[in-house]
From Swiss-Prot:
It comes from Aspergillus clavatus (strain ATCC 1007 / CBS 513.65 / DSM 816 / NCTC 3887 / NRRL 1 / QM 1276 / 107). Its main location: secreted. Pfam families: Fn3-like, Glyco_hydro_3, Glyco_hydro_3_C, PA14. Pathway: Glycan metabolism; cellulose degradation. It is found in: Secreted. The lineage of its organism: Eukaryota, Fungi, Dikarya, Ascomycota, Pezizomycotina. Residues 389-548 form the PA14 domain. The gene is bglH. InterPro entries: Cellulose_deg_GH3, Fn3-like, Glyco_hydro_3_C, Glyco_hydro_3_C_sf, Glyco_hydro_3_N, Glyco_hydro_3_N_sf, Glycoside_hydrolase_SF, Ig-like_fold. It catalyses: Hydrolysis of terminal, non-reducing beta-D-glucosyl residues with release of beta-D-glucose. This is Probable beta-glucosidase H. Belongs to the glycosyl hydrolase 3 family. Beta-glucosidases are one of a number of cellulolytic enzymes involved in the degradation of cellulosic biomass. Catalyzes the last step releasing glucose from the inhibitory cellobiose.
Length: 829
């Protein structure tokens, strides 16, 4: 915490150069400081599910929370508030004043690369979860920068794509989560998106800023996404306060020239500088640590475990196969995710965790006397797993010259694995635009045989083992999707190795600009990156046979697989909803011999196809669960946690069923949001398409009974007076548990095309066995309103409305109704 300063005094005292310097960052994470006026540098930090700190490379470890869709699946305001507090506390430990989150874009397609970062396909649920996590974070003094405003709902050509969306869909679906934040949370900062909306980049569009500041009366600091500023004059005049990161590419001396040419007014510079100073004045009072460090307290671990367990969705549980008993003679654990948990997606969400609990280790804790058989069954990785536990004495040395020339060592950095991102790395004397590095280390395999190696790079790289070249990813390169869409495909090589023998590995690396690969529409963060992975070469058919044998011999089988950050990441979208190759075949083969005693655990941030689902008795959706992934899953499997989570998005049976299937790529620089307002369950219900699992679905180990009648008061609704819907619920099952009652509103008499029904409220209710409660859910003016494109206002239409209480969007258990006597138009929040 620094000394306070008076914004007016500083603004009136500083030079024009200082005012201009305030409008852009100084480096990857910090704003400009004016020490003589007590204006400190403000530190920002990623990411949506954790706090990385200031380093992508060799960073300080951090708490990794479950991913956005997992948080959304809790439908738990209080738990999200606690998650926000933890994120704020992590920021303070890292010396950061501003958390770059949460992400509240919409999953209009299950294929969006960052779909796992956002909370839900429904704007009400998304906005409500965002409100809770923001208020939690900002209660610590840390400012939340909600993102990405607006329309960055897919990664394909995200900097260049023109999102073509109707005003109604923009308002009702994509802007509404931000509108809820503006009304209920007032986060101190907002980040713009990379993309265009209807012909103009959001960052340069005055109309998009007017919605925030004039219509919603919300005045956050507005910053660009990283390298998401494209002009000097247009972005300044439109309303962008802060260009990130620094050093500036479009401000600085360019602003001076624009002012001299009277293309930017002095008053505009003063307005933007004032906003940055107000941001700094507030943020600097957060009690941030002077030294970047971690915390990893027992209470943090307990909270993370609670969040993970409460996020896990029980999709299917025929004949109450779950929960499993804790007295089991022999259990088979199958799948690479059993020992290598998927704790997060890729990109900004990826960080160095304090620790990661595997399902294997968690089950050993629960079943200390049980014989446990483990088989991989099939690989789920896209890139070979990074070398870590078999790596020793590894360092990276940095130079300004390539390896074939005489060169001067600039720095030496110890590393504990063979993956690195250097977008924000710097050391004295380093030429950031063009440099080279050498990674040296010792690799001691634990099994003899043929080992596969894979090398992916943003830049150039060559792998040597005992000075023999094994992979050349320098001479000829093929573009892939890694490293925010700028990397190569994985080039592979193989070498016969002996267990226990130590081999010298060496990677000769050239920074980003040594690569000839160019790409349109992706973000060029610079620096470069590389990923070296290794795995014992295995016969895939024999792996399946071994898994089948284990399942046939065990009393129970847990098959845990899915996606990971190789498949779901910032920088690219998925091409399909498929699980990794051979996974479906593995699951089918295991179900053939042990279907009556097998539980399928899927880890993914968004839906995957499950062609075997009708044959599986029990299916669990475990998302990306953070540090406590293994514990969270085991808690649900063995009944220590009664599952209560609900899907925050619809789960289509086939990728071709999803509403954005024909419009999920940038074509000719444009992407048509052809589904309009019919996103997610709104689409499936409108056309009568059955999903594999509906929005809001999730089972429990207990039973609930809800009174069939909803009492609505008052029965005549106006936009000035919210109404209340009251219903009774009882836990009629054998154990305590929670049910999430979802309130949908339908407008059957409306002359305007509308969804069959829309989520407008919810309540998570915890009940002991036999306990009964009265639940009251409030409904506000959003429930009866749609965006009138002719009047350019919200319209609450006269008519009869139905209140539908469901345990999912498909399972409606109670009904009521109310009327709106008079049509009303309104604006604002």
């Amino acid at each position: 915490m620094t000394a306070k300063f008076d914004v007016d005094h500083v603004l009136n005292s500083i030079s024009e150069d200082d005012k201009i310097a305030l409008l852009s960052g100084t480096d990857f994470w910090h704003t400009y400081s004016i020490p003589e006026h007590n204006v400190p540098p403000i530190r920002t930090t990623d990411g949506p599910n954790g706090v990385r700190g200031t380093k992508f490379f060799a960073g300080v470890p951090a708490a990794c929370l479950p991913c956005g869709t997992a948080l959304g699946a809790t439908w738990d305001r209080d738990l999200l508030h606690k998650a926000g507090v933890l994120l704020g506390q992590e920021c303070l430990a890292k010396g950061a004043h501003c958390w770059l989150g949460p992400t509240i874009n919409m999953q209009r397609s299950p294929l969006g690369g960052r779909g796992f970062e956002s909370f839900a396909e429904d704007p009400h649920l998304s906005g409500t979860m965002a409100k809770s996590i923001i208020l939690g974070c900002e209660s610590t003094g840390v400012i939340s920068a909600v993102k990405h405003y607006v329309g960055n709902d897919q990664e394909h050509e995200r900097r260049a794509v023109d999102v073509m969306v109707t005003p109604r869909a923009l308002r009702e679906i994509y802007l509404r989560p931000f509108q809820i934040v503006a009304r209920d949370a007032h986060s101190g900062a907002l980040m713009t998106s990379y993309n265009k909306i209807n012909g103009k980049h959001v960052v340069e569009n005055p109309a998009m800023y007017d919605i925030i500041r004039k219509e919603w009366k919300w005045d956050p600091l507005i910053m660009s996404d990283w390298l998401g500023t494209y002009t000097t004059i247009d972005s300044l005049n439109a309303g962008l306060d802060l260009e990130m990161p620094g050093p500036s590419r479009y401000r600085g001396k360019y602003i001076e020239s624009a002012v001299q040419a009277r293309l930017v007014k002095q008053s505009t510079i003063d307005q933007r500088a004032r906003k940055v100073l107000e941001f700094a004045a507030r943020a600097s009072q957060a009690p941030a640590s002077a030294v970047e460090s971690g915390r990893d307290y027992p209470e943090d671990r307990a909270l993370n475990r609670e969040i993970c367990g409460n996020s896990i969705v029980l999709l299917k549980n025929e004949d109450t196969l779950l929960p499993l008993p804790k007295k089991i003679k022999k259990i088979a654990l199958i799948g690479s995710h059993v020992k290598t948990p998927a704790i997060s997606g890729g990109g900004s969400a990826s960080l160095q965790p304090y620790y990661a609990v595997s399902l294997y280790d968690a089950i050993i804790e629960v079943l200390p006397d049980t014989e446990i058989i483990y088989e991989t069954g099939a690989y789920a990785h896209k890139m070979l797993p990074v070398i870590d536990r078999m790596l020793s004495n590894a360092v990276i040395r940095f130079y300004n010259e390539p390896a074939d020339k005489e060169r001067t060592l600039l720095s030496t950095e110890p590393v504990n694995n063979t993956a690195f991102q250097l977008m924000d790395y710097n050391t004295p004397g380093l030429n950031r635009t063009l440099f080279w590095a050498t990674l040296d280390g010792e690799f001691t395999p634990d099994v003899s045989g043929l080992w596969d190696f894979g090398l992916t790079v943003f830049g150039t790289a060559t792998l040597y083992i005992d000075d023999e070249m094994v992979i050349d990813n320098t001479t000829q390169q093929t573009r892939g999707t890694a490293f925010f869409g700028k990397g190569t495909i994985q080039e592979v090589g193989a070498k016969e190795l002996t267990a226990g023998r130590t081999y010298k590995i060496r990677i000769e690396f050239g920074s980003a600009n040594t690569s000839p690969i160019k790409a349109i529409g992706v973000v060029h963060f610079g620096g470069g990156a590389a990923h070296l992975g290794a795995f014992l070469h295995m016969d895939p058919e024999q792996m399946v046979r071994d898994a089948v044998k284990a399942a046939s011999e065990a009393d129970y089988t847990i098959l845990c697989t899915g996606l990971n950050r190789d498949w779901e990441s910032e920088g690219f979208d998925r091409p399909d909803m498929d699980l990794p190759p051979r996974i479906d075949a593995l699951i089918s083969a295991v179900l053939d011999v042990a279907g009556d005693k097998t539980i399928i655990v899927n880890q993914s941030g968004t839906p995957v196809m499950m062609p075997w689902s009708d044959r599986a008795r029990a299916i669990i959706q475990a998302w990306y669960g953070g540090n406590e992934t293994g514990h969270g899953i085991a808690d649900v499997l063995f009944g220590d946690v009664n599952p209560c989570a609900k899907l925050p998005l619809s789960w289509p049976a086939d990728v071709r069923h999803n509403p954005a299937y024909l419009n999920s790529l940038s074509v000719g620089g444009r992407m048509l949001y052809g589904e309009d307002i019919y996103v997610g369950y709104r689409f499936y219900e409108k056309i009568g398409q059955v999903t594999l699992f509906p929005f809001g679905h999730g089972l429990s180990y207990t039973l609930f009974e809800v009174s069939p009648k909803v009492t609505v008061s008052p029965t005549a609704f106006t936009v000035e007076t919210p109404l209340s819907a009251t219903v009774r619920i009882k836990n009629t099952g054998p154990v305590a548990g929670a049910q999430i009652l979802q309130l949908y509103v339908a407008a059957p008499t409306s002359a305007t095309p509308r969804p069959v029904k829309e989520l407008q409220g919810f309540s998570k209710v915890f009940l002991q066995s036999g306990e009964e409660k009265t639940v009251v859910i409030s409904v506000d003016k959003y429930a009866t309103s749609f965006w009138d494109g002719i009047e350019d206002m919200w319209k609450s239409e006269a008519g009869v409305y139905q209140v539908l209480i469901g345990t999912s969007s498909q399972d409606i258990v109670a009904r009521g109704e109310f009327t709106v006597d008079e049509t009303t138009f309104w604006t604002g929040v």
